[in-house]
Amino acid sequence: MANEQVLTAEQVIDKARSYLSDEHIAFVEKAYLYAEDAHREQYRKSGEPYIIHPIQVAGILVDLEMDPSTIAGGFLHDVVEDTDVTLDDLKEAFSEEVAMLVDGVTKLGKIKYKSQEEQQAENHRKMFVAMAQDIRVILIKLADRLHNMRTLKHLPQEKQRRISNETLEIFAPLAHRLGISKIKWELEDTALRYLNPQQYYRIVNLMKKKRAERELYVDEVVNEVKKRVEEVNIKADFSGRPKHIYSIYRKMVLQNKQFNEIYDLLAVRILVNSIKDCYAVLGIIHTCWKPMPGRFKDYIAMPKPNMYQSLHTTVIGPKGDPLEVQIRTFEMHEIAEYGVAAHWAYKEGKAANEGATFEKKLSWFREILEFQNESTDAEEFMESLKIDLFSDMVYVFTPKGDVIELPSGSVPIDFSYRIHSEIGNKTIGAKVNGKMVTLDHKLRTGDIVEILTSKHSYGPSQDWVKLAQTSQAKHKIRQFFKKQRREENVEKGRELVEKEIKNLDFELKDVLTPENIQKVADKFNFSNEEDMYAAVGYNGITALQVANRLTEKERKQRDQEEQEKIVQEVTGEPKPYPQGRKREAGVRVKGIDNLLVRLSKCCNPVPGDDIVGFITKGRGVSVHREDCPNVKTNEAQERLIPVEWEHESQVQKRKEYNVEIEILGYDRRGLLNEVLQAVNETKTNISSVSGKSDRNKVATIHMAIFIQNINHLHKVVERIKQIRDIYSVRRVMN
C-alpha cells in the first residue's frame, strides 16, 4: 500500500476502468470534475494544489477496488468542509448515498468547544455514528488519513506528533479491527517515524544490515518446503515477509528486549487453493522442523472477528532460530490484506446473501456503537470506545463451546451481558473452568465460563457498573435501573448533585435556580431536570459532572479572587512599571498590569507559543510553555496563572530568543556543514552547536539558535528538513 508516487486523476480513473463499467466510470469522472472546480485556487501546506489530496484518496480506494459511490466520496470528501458546497448540492448533483458518505467524514463546524480535545472527540463520535450506518464511511476516512500521513512532513512538528498519536490510538487499531492490514501496517510504521524517529531509523538500519542473511535463510526454508509440497501434488505460492517496523518496536518495548534479541523478524507465508491443503502443508512444516509449544494458532477453525483466517505456527528453523509460518488459501489472503474492503469491493452480480452474511459479521461493531451513543460526553465516548474496539482481546468459551470475544480485563458480568441482557440481569454467580469465581474475576483466553442465574433475582447491583469493563454491559445495567426505578433515581440523583455542590462549598440557593438547572440539562441533551437527575441516579452521568456545570460561573469567580489573593501573598506589592515604559519580556498577566514577568530558561518560550505563568516566591511570574514538564506537576498546578503575549507595539524591542533544536540524520561526510549553511541562509544566529553519532550511523546534532518568533523557528526547521539524509528536526527543552 505504501506509495510515494503522486497519481493524476487520469491515472486513477484508468485504474478504475479495469473493473468498473463505462456508466460507473462516467459517474466517477463527474465527481472528480466537481471536486476540481470546488477546490480551485486552494492549496495544501506543501504548496501543491489541494485537489491533489482528493485524487490520492480516490486512488487508494480504487486500489481497494471500491464501488463507484465510495470512489466519488473519496474525490468529494472535503468539499463540504472546505468549500461553499453543501450536502444538498451533493444530493442533487450525485445521490443521497454519496452525500451521506461525505457527511460521515465531514468534521463538525461552526460550534464552539471548550478545548481542541473535546472538538476532536465530537468529530470522531460523528464519524463512528456515520460508520455504524455505512462502513464505507471509515474506508474513505482511512484512505484520507493514509494520504495525510504520507504527506505529514509538510506540517509543524507539534502537529505531526498529534496526528501520529491519534493515528496509533484510533485509525491503525480501527484498520486492524476491520482487517485492512495493508493500511494498518503503513499507518503504524509512518506514525512511529514521526513519534520516535531515532528508534525507527535504528530498526531500519539494523534490518538493512541483516537483509542478505535473512533472504538466504528464507530461500533455504522455502526450497525445503516446496520440495515436500510438490511431492504430494499441492500447488502453493511462497513468500518471505519481514516483520513491520512498528511490530518489532512494540515487541522490543513490551518484552524489554534489544533488537538483536528479537529472533522472529520474518515470517514465511504459504498460499494454497483449499482448506484441506492448508492442514496438509501444516503437517509437512511440523515434519520438517519442531513446533514451539504454545505457538500454534488455528484461525481457520476459529476466525478473528475481523474475518481473518489463517494457520499460524512457529517452529525451530534450520539454524535453530524461531521461524513463524502462516498458511492460508488465496481467498483468505485477500481478506487478510483488505479485510472489510474486500467484502465491499465492487463485483458485478454480487449475491444478496453474501452482503447479508457480511453485515451479520459486523453486527458486533454496530452493537458497540449503539451502546456508546448513550454517553453524553464525547471524550468519555471515545475513551470507552477505545476499550471496546481497540484494546487487546481475550477469547473465552461458553459451556457449549461457542467462542466469545471480549476486551482484555473483562469479567463474568461482561460475558453474561454479551450472551443476553436477561441472562445478565438474572446473574447470581459464575464458574470459570468448573470453579466458582467472584463477579470481578478477570477472564483469560481459553477460559470456559458458565453463568449461574436465578429467576428470583431482583436484577443487577448498582456496583456492577463499576465492575463491568465493556460498554455493552454498562449500558444494559443502566437501562435496567432506568426502566425499573425512575422516581427513585430522580430523588437519588438530586440528592447526589446537591451533596456534590455542598462539597464544592457553594450555597444551593445560589446555584440551583430554575434557569441554571435547565441550561445545564440542555448542555447534557436532557429535555428536563428530572431526566438529568434520573441519569445521575442510574449512573448514566456522574453527580460531579452535573455539579461542575451548575457551579461553572461561581467557580470562575472564586478562582479569580483566589488568584489575586495568591499573587498578593507570594509577590507582595510589586513595583509598578514606570509610566510609558514597555515590557522587555513581551508578556502580561491577564487582568493584572504591574507584575514582574520573566521568561523561563527551562523551555525558552517565544512569541507565538502557548504559554502559562507560574507564580514564584518573591520573583514575580515565570513564563513557561504550556507543554513544559515543570508546570505539569500537581504542586505547580496550584500556582499557575493565565498570561498572554503582548502586541509588538507594547513591547520594548527584544530581537532574539534562545531556542534549542535537535537534528537527527544519516551520519555522512559534510552533513553538519550543510546544516550550518542552511541555518545561515535563514539569517539566524547560532550560539552553540554539538554533535555525535551512534554505531548505527545516526547523527544527532544539538544546536542553540536565536530567533524572533515561532514563525522564524518554523522557517529554520523547514529549511533544515530540506537537506538530504535528515530524519527529523525538533525543538527541545533544557
Swiss-Prot record:
One of its GO terms (biological process) is guanosine tetraphosphate biosynthetic process. PROSITE patterns: ACT, HD, TGS. Signal peptide: none annotated. The keyword GTP-binding applies. Disulfide bonds: none annotated. Keywords: ATP-binding, GTP-binding, Kinase, Nucleotide-binding, Transferase. Residues 50-149 form the HD domain. InterPro entries: ACT-like_dom_sf, ACT_dom, Beta-grasp_dom_sf, HD/PDEase_dom, HD_domain, NT_sf, RelA/Spo_fam, RelA/SpoT_AH_RIS. Pathway: Purine metabolism; ppGpp biosynthesis; ppGpp from GTP: step 1/2. Residues 660-734 form the ACT domain. Activated by the cyclic di-AMP (c-di-AMP) receptor DarB in the absence of c-di-AMP. Residues 552-584 are annotated as: Disordered. Its EC number is 2.7.6.5. GO terms for molecular function: ATP binding; GTP binding; GTP diphosphokinase activity; kinase activity. Residues 552-567 have a biased composition (Basic and acidic residues). Residues 392-453 form the TGS domain. It catalyses: GTP + ATP = guanosine 3'-diphosphate 5'-triphosphate + AMP. In eubacteria ppGpp (guanosine 3'-diphosphate 5'-diphosphate) is a mediator of the stringent response that coordinates a variety of cellular activities in response to changes in nutritional abundance. This enzyme catalyzes the formation of pppGpp which is then hydrolyzed to form ppGpp, it is probably the hydrolysis activity that is required for optimal growth. Homodimer. At very low potassium concentrations, when intracellular levels of c-di-AMP are low, interacts with apo-DarB. c-di-AMP inhibits the binding of DarB to RelA. Belongs to the RelA/SpoT family. This is GTP pyrophosphokinase. It comes from Bacillus subtilis (strain 168).
